[in-house]
């Protein structure tokens, strides 16, 4: 029995094909021969068209995803325009869209592909990496500032508790009498303060592990440098959730 199941088209490819065919998006169009599409205005595309393809407004992430699906960047006569090509992505060729799938690349094939890329493609990838590294560096600085602030707070608490413990060692039960004597005073006329040293341990245990988070962020920043050759997962590459 023949299966009636229709070929599956990736959401990103289907939506890309839709907006290229939509005349209301003047910033992304087919070429005259209909074999390629080009972006006439990157700024306008990021503001108007990109939100229909992605939850992010990062143009470099959009370009990277095109490469993942096998698109290549063609040389454009206009420096302000970018043109992309895929043998199965063409005008009036919606029946070919199921053939466009994510490429599965090993480290060796990814290395070979990056070696054969044009300078423009490599520049786009480097720009994306630089943007991600800049964001990570900002997060690291923010975490370091929080660590410094937390250290000051902890040092202040330690000094305060040290003074309290010294007083507590000389007089374990500190009484603050209210017009009473030490002996025989009613319980409702005295304030007894007992200090428990175990509270210090609980206080230190409740301190957030910022050092661990800082170390993880540094590891992420280091891994980002190996992005071109070591990453083949779409979500980890872009930190972008395309739908």
UniProtKB/Swiss-Prot annotation:
The gene is HSF. This is Probable heat shock transcription factor. Residues 121-164 are annotated as: Involved in trimerization. It is found in: Nucleus. Homotrimer. Homotrimerization increases the affinity of HSF1 to DNA. The keyword Oxidoreductase does not apply. It comes from Vairimorpha ceranae (strain BRL01). DNA-binding transcription factor that specifically binds heat shock promoter elements (HSE) and activates transcription. Keywords: Activator, DNA-binding, Nucleus, Stress response, Transcription, Transcription regulation.
């Amino acid at each position: 029995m023949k299966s009636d199941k229709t070929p599956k088209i990736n959401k990103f490819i289907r939506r890309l094909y839709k907006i290229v065919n939509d005349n209301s998006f003047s910033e992304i169009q087919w070429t005259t021969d209909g074999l390629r599409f080009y972006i006439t205005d990157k700024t306008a595309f990021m503001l108007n068209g990109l939100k229909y393809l992605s939850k992010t407004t990062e143009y470099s992430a959009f370009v990277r995803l095109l490469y993942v699906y096998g698109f290549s960047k063609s040389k454009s006569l206009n420096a302000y325009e970018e043109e992309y090509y895929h043998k199965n992505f063409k005008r009036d060729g919606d029946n070919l869209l199921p053939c466009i799938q994510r490429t599965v690349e090993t480290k060796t094939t990814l290395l070979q592909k990056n070696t054969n890329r044009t300078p423009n493609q490599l520049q786009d990838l480097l720009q994306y990496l630089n943007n991600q590294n800049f964001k990570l560096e900002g997060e690291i600085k923010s975490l370091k500032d929080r660590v410094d602030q937390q250290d000051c707070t902890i040092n202040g608490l330690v000094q305060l508790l040290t003074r309290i413990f010294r007083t507590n060692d000389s007089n374990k039960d500190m009484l603050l009498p209210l017009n009473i004597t030490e002996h025989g005073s009613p319980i409702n006329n005295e304030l007894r303060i007992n200090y428990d040293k175990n509270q210090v341990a609980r206080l230190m245990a409740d301190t957030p592990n910022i050092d661990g988070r800082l170390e993880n962020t540094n590891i992420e920043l280091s891994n980002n440098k190996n992005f071109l050759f070591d990453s083949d997962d779409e979500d980890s590459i872009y930190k972008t959730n395309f739908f």
